[in-house]
Amino acid sequence: MSQQVIIFDTTLRDGEQALQASLSVKEKLQIALALERMGVDVMEVGFPVSSPGDFESVQTIALQVKNSRVCALARCVEKDIDVAAESLKVAEAFRIHTFIATSPMHIATKLRSTLDEVIERAIYMVKRARNYTDDVEFSCEDAGRTPIADLARVVEAAINAGATTINIPDTVGYTMPFEFAGIISGLYERVPNIDKAIISVHTHDDLGLAVGNSLAAVHAGARQVEGAMNGIGERAGNCSLEEVIMAIKVRKDILNVHTAINHQEIWRTSQLVSQICNMPIPANKAIVGSGAFAHSSGIHQDGVLKNRENYEIMTPESIGLNQIQLNLTSRSGRAAVKHRMDEMGYKESEYNLDNLYDAFLKLADKKGQVFDYDLEALAFIGKQQEEPEHFRLDYFSVQSGSNDIATAAVKLACGEEVKAEAANGNGPVDAVYQAINRITDYNVELVKYSLTAKGHGKDALGQVDIVANYNGRRFHGVGLATDIVESSAKAMVHVLNNIWRAAEVEKELQRKAQHNENNKETV
């Protein structure tokens, strides 16, 4: 009988470190709920002591997620563990994940300590975490470059202190698969109490070996794999969870293990992470790339038509990618749109049907037929822009040509007031942005601009994702339309609303702090 491999997702903690702009609490919650729907066993959602924003994100997700265990990261520092526990206490089930470096290089140059002192601190902090929960994970940072005898000492001590999961990270993506398998096997041979904990692995992709190392570790006895959707993460990224999950499913004959993942949710979750994080998926990305199931060779096409198994080791449907897509028109009713959303697996709580249907009709009038990918894009944009808006794009027009200076006129609703400005720019998009800056006086600096086609052909929707700098902080914005300039304008307005909302939150926090201070003085 096969054993289960626990899937530990760190998209919202380690994965977020790769992003140019931090995710909002709402965006993190969207991803967390998608991960829960996909069936991840554990989700690491933040580092609460690092900032009030991270604390709020962890607390919000802990309150909402019911079917996955919510985890927070903490260094082997008392305050870290106490704050992590405080942020997680509202959760249905939670885990505290604490870590300390164990390699000679890290101990000597980073910690300026000794192995004995590291072990002593690990024991104390694991015990402290156990005061809050029975589920404590301990990580040996840079385990891949830690001598096996030293690593075994640390692991044995952490298990004796109460750690229920021991994580072995290849922190810098240095280890080869056969080496990593040897580390796991070596721990099973050397640590007498290893049967009292689950052995986990956390690999990085600096040499392109993250997935290979994780699978080698599973083959050697590891029973938890940590990673991020689409492999996002610091430097070259984390282990791609979708790749490990499908490798375990497809090669069960070799690995003899399974996961509790709902495979049909993989593609949808991957797309959501890509959209929210503003990180396009390469076409040749394994499992979820747009070309993952494409066949261009005539010989391959002929073979697939005769029997898909000739050249496909898994089907698009196995990850939730349905190739037959129903098209809707402006004559399709609200019920038809809802029915299609139901068929694609969306719950009513995940989108506003009235808003979605209004956006659908406008799009159908422009392009005639609306496909599944159009509906998904509209639902995503609608969810992103549900929060209160101070700015709204009322009108814009542009004039440009090969020998002309681009000019834009923009009307922007700012609260109850509508303001208008015109400006020149280096192309129509820049002209629109210059006009918007004149209206608001925010003077945001564009850091990143990307355009993604949602669909196929000349009528495809264009999704514009931008990152803008304002007062030392980075804000993300997204816009969607059949017209690229309109998408660009909407993305900038989304940025402005995010800036405005952040300022409102700051005002509210200051108001509460002042209120608390006044109460103290009264007492």
Swiss-Prot record:
Belongs to the alpha-IPM synthase/homocitrate synthase family. LeuA type 1 subfamily. Its cofactor is Mn(2+). Its main location: cytoplasm. Pathway: Amino-acid biosynthesis; L-leucine biosynthesis; L-leucine from 3-methyl-2-oxobutanoate: step 1/4. GO terms for cellular component: cytosol. CDD domains: DRE_TIM_IPMS. SMART domains: LeuA_dimer. One of its GO terms (biological process) is L-leucine biosynthetic process. Residues 392-523 are annotated as: Regulatory domain. It comes from the Bacteria. Catalyzes the condensation of the acetyl group of acetyl-CoA with 3-methyl-2-oxobutanoate (2-ketoisovalerate) to form 3-carboxy-3-hydroxy-4-methylpentanoate (2-isopropylmalate). Residues 5-267 form the Pyruvate carboxyltransferase domain. Homodimer. It is an enzyme of class 2 (transferase). Mn(2+) binds at D14, H202, H204, N238. Its EC number is 2.3.3.13. This is 2-isopropylmalate synthase. It is found in: Cytoplasm. The keyword Zinc-finger does not apply. It catalyses: 3-methyl-2-oxobutanoate + acetyl-CoA + H2O = (2S)-2-isopropylmalate + CoA + H(+). Keywords: Amino-acid biosynthesis, Branched-chain amino acid biosynthesis, Cytoplasm, Leucine biosynthesis, Manganese, Metal-binding, Transferase. GO terms for molecular function: 2-isopropylmalate synthase activity; acetyl-CoA C-acetyltransferase activity; manganese ion binding.
